[in-house]
Amino acid sequence: MDNRKEPPFFNDDNMGPFYYRLHFCDTMELFIETLTGTCFELRVSPFETVISVKAKIRRLEGIPICRQHLIWNNMELENDYCLNDYNISEGCTLKLVLAMRGGPINTRRVPTDDPLRKMAEYLDSSRVEVWEKTSCSKQVTFLVYQEGDQLNFFPAVDRGDGTLTPLSDSSKKIDFHLHVLRRKGEHRMSGGSMYNSDTDEDEETEPSSSGQQIIENSITMNKMKLLKAKMKNMNLSKKPKKAVKIKPHPPVAPRPSSGSTAPSRHRLLRVLPNIGQSCSPAFGNAYPPEISRNGISSLATQLSAERYISSITGEFLKEDNSWENNTLSHFSSNVKLPPQIPHLELGNDQELADSVLHLGSSLPRQTKHFLGNLPSSNGNIVLPSEECVTEQSLLPKVGSLASFAEGNADEQSSGLEGACKVNLELLLTNADKGLKAPEQHLKHVAGVLNGESVETSVLNYRELSPHKNRLLSPLRCSAPMSLHNSLVKPERQSKCFEFGKLQPSSSQSLDVQNITDSSFSRTTCFQGVKVDSLGKRSDVISKVEARDITEMTNKASKEPVGCVNNISFLASLAGSTSRNRLQSTRGAGRLQNSGTGLSTNLQHFQEENFRKSSPQLEHTGVFLSTHGVGMNGNNAAAGKSVGECTTHHLPPVKAPLQTKKKTTNHCFLCGKKTGLASSYECRCGNNFCASHRYAETHGCTYDYKSAGRRYLHEANPVVNAPKLPKI
């Protein structure tokens, strides 16, 4: 304790460490030089770590520690070592190098064995030996620096002690170029050395993984486009095909022999149903539909649905020459084509004969028998208008064809007991052609019947009553027939085409019954005779019009039949009047199905009056034409009853005795059925439903403005006050 200047300690043994600690407190001056040449002085301790020195530089200059790199004797100082470890004494100069802001973009360690061999394609052939000089046990690090769109790669070897050295000891540049495809365009990666040496050298560009992915995406997109195109073609091919267009053709089966009655029954036309109904067999056919269709559609079952049925008119006429001569001779002498019908569809007289229904001939009455005993020289030929070849054929909505009833073989000499089947119309399924094709076909019934006075073409009610699903179709004719081109010769007798029952004892009654249909009972709302037209839907005859027709018929019975202008067929007259009433309706519910039966509005013709006139009657042929109304849409009469000039009369018709039927109201705009609470009558005079009852919804034609002015004028009359005398 001699030296009083020293502080006292507990013992003398601590003097050694005491001097050591005093030596630790010594400081020294260091000079820090930057790359720009700026130099500043820093006082540090020799036992201070490098990171503490960097912290002092950060406090002095504001440079972040992560960006500071101190280099002394070409060696970077580690953060964990002291200055004394590097033998840095007082007065030494340390170089301060600033790192890139944010650090390297990507640092990836690549083993030098196999991956570097695979990456040799990215290197020049002269630089492959650079990788061979390196040890396989060491790792190679790529320092990536970004300058705009250019990436600089600096390969270096990790020595394992935390230091990175260039891959080549010499100043040889180890740069290589990678071609990278980016989203915004192509950007080139240029290589450089650790010493910022940039030179232009040969490049080898290869598409990277992103480029390959883009190529694969384009290939996949092309495949998807091809697949979508194929799917679109498949969807187009799955669309329903158009209706198969079938031309009218004669029946396939040969005509029945003279002594057979059963084949004549089954050689009948199939009833063409409406859309939504099943094909029902012909009237009077006791066999299944397969047997009933055997005579008519034997050829149709052998042909495909997509092919047109070829006409076999020639073969059929060659097979039966007698029928051909008979039909052609009587057709040419009795029935002539109206001038409105073009001769384009009928190529020759054979097709003309096949297209016309020939119900009778001009043979003597003693040899005329219908369906009972048919002579070989006289064939009662019924030509089908069309056959249901496939279910895919879309038939237009037409009335069902009237069919033959059974004949009675016991009364061959006296006439017929059954009914004669009538081909009512010739159909075409190509309705999409604007109904131009039906204009070129004959649709008339040649009601030329010769024989006894009791021979009348009828439709027996007893044959029709068991078949609830078969309906009578109204007669059709393509053009109005005149008196001279539609009837037989004046010396021939003509028959009247009627509906009813035929009494064999020369007493006839015209009994028109109501044939109900199970399918039509659900949809038909009106009762009346409906007349089908080719261009429009069926129309309905009201009760008042039916009474008018009956009165006109009674008046016509007292006059000669030869007055053509005074007689109008009941269906054609009603069709022209009721068409104007129903033409403005828009709903489908207002218009009923085309094929429907005769209603009870024309029931119970007076049997006694008909019996009185039946022995002397020689009835006339009746023709109906809907061509004028269906095609032209005019308001003229649909057809005329054309009769031969004779002195005989039509039977008187009694007005139908029927109770009132409940009428239903429909909306004038949409056709919706309206009840008692949902019927609204507008001031324009029409009935509307709840949604269309307002004037702005149905376009009311009532002038509300003028009516309002009138009401205001009546409620508020103009009052002229008397002038007050001046005072």
UniProtKB/Swiss-Prot annotation:
Transmembrane regions listed in the UniProt entry: none
Binding site for Zn(2+) 2: 682, 684, 698, 700
Zinc finger regions, AN1-type: 661-708
Gene that produces this protein: ZFAND4
Lineage: Eukaryota, Metazoa, Chordata, Craniata, Vertebrata
Basic residues: compositionally biased ranges: 238-248
Region of interest (Disordered), ranges: 187-217, 238-264
Every Ubiquitin-like domain range: 28-103
UniProt KW keywords: Metal-binding, Zinc, Zinc-finger
GO molecular function: zinc ion binding
Protein name: AN1-type zinc finger protein 4
InterPro entries: AN1-like_Znf, AN1-type_zinc_finger, Ubiquitin-like_dom, Ubiquitin-like_domsf, Ubiquitin_dom, Znf_AN1
List of residues binding Zn(2+) 1: 667, 670, 689, 692
